[in-house]
Each structure stands twice: as structure tokens, then as C-alpha cells.
Amino acid sequence: MMADVAALAAGAIRFASGVSFLVDPARADRWWGARKTPDATAQLLWRSMGYRDALIGGLLLAAALRGTNTRGWFLASGGADAADLLGGMAVHDQLPRSQQVVGLGGAVVGIGVGLWGATRRRRPAEKT
């Protein structure tokens, strides 16, 4: 069985990102461009995104390691980023430029990766 390297990479990145949001939401907030310590509501939202991303990333990673179909998990990953983009667009004019670029730009890239992963053709594994 040949490993799905793209699913391994995408799953590992989303899983690690989610865990980092859970472990240190203040650092995640700064990394995404915030200039001050996040309040309790922002920390709750970072942790909620962390649970979501760790779950989706972990399940994408697990499917890749098992050699099972990863399309649905790629689609879930892209859907999570689409929700982030939609929410971000509602406050786009209130975000500093750094958050517009990193947060919304990252969501656009994530949507693209999710759609690519869900629709790509995979060669059947060679029999040995």
C-alpha cells in the first residue's frame, strides 16, 4: 500500500495547528496578527477552532495512514476553512491588514487544498 503523502501532510498540518490553538490560544492569536492578549471570548473561539482542526486533521491523517479514502476529510477541511472565510468576511473591514492577509488568505488557501484533495485522481496502489 502506497501512502497518500498529500493527505498525510495536510492532516498533519491541520492537526498540529489545532493542537497549538488548544495549548496556547494567546500565541495562536498573536501568530494570526493580533496585537494584544485575547480576552476570554477570543480564547474560547481559538480553542473551539483547535478542537475542530485537531479532529479533522487527525481523522485525515488516520485515513491516510490506513490507506482509506481521504476525500471526505479533505472536503471537511476545506469546509472548515470556508466557514472561517465567511465569518472573516463579515468583519473584514474591522481587521488589521495583517489579520486580513494571514487569516483570510490562509482560509482561501485551505479551501483550495480541501477542494483539490477531495477532487483529485489517485492512482490505484500497485500490487506487490
Give the location of each predicted region.
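Short amphipathic, positively biased membrane-proximal segments
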Residues: 1-128
